[in-house]
Amino acid sequence: KDGYLMGADGCKLCVLTAPYDYCACE
């Protein structure tokens, strides 16, 4: 849980976790 990016919709949450990153709708 290093970086969090919220989308404009406020639903998309991108988490950067080495060595890969994933986006999830919380």
Swiss-Prot record:
Keywords: Ion channel impairing toxin, Neurotoxin, Secreted, Toxin, Voltage-gated sodium channel impairing toxin. Expressed by the venom gland. The keyword Secreted applies. It is found in: Secreted. One of its GO terms (cellular component) is extracellular region. GO terms for molecular function: sodium channel regulator activity; toxin activity. Belongs to the long (4 C-C) scorpion toxin superfamily. Sodium channel inhibitor family. Beta subfamily. Beta toxins bind voltage-independently at site-4 of sodium channels (Nav) and shift the voltage of activation toward more negative potentials thereby affecting sodium channel activation and promoting spontaneous and repetitive firing. This toxin is active against mammals and crustaceans. This is Toxin TdII-1. It comes from Tityus discrepans (Venezuelan scorpion).
